[in-house]
Amino acid sequence: MDLEHPTPIRPEEHASFDANRMGKSTLFQSERLLVGLNAFEPGQEHRLHAHAGLDKVYHVLAGSGLFLLEGREVPMTAGTLLVAPAEVPHGIRNTGSTRLLVLAILAPSP
């Protein structure tokens, strides 16, 4: 997404839902930062994965589910902020009956 700054962004307007897999949208990217949007239909999951040298912050915008982190399952609802440090396996599962929308911020940018 090409933006002029300052530009207000309404993440939900850029959500890309897919019936077959988690939807992903990039809202902003520079050499230092990536701001993305993950969109989950009920039952969808972003399997455990890790990022070498990148910290990741998730902010739940809508819906509910589970944050998977090092063998733990942490409940998440709208307004929850979660951190996945570099090299730590993490994932997300939509366990709710509605769509789950999660802002994902990675630094530095991949």
Predicted features and spans:
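General beta-strand recognition
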Residues: 34, 66-68, 91, 101
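A short, N-terminal "cap"/entry segment at the start of jelly-roll beta-barrel domains
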Residues: 1-36, 47
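Short, conserved beta-strand element in jelly-roll/cupin
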Residues: 39-41, 50-67, 105
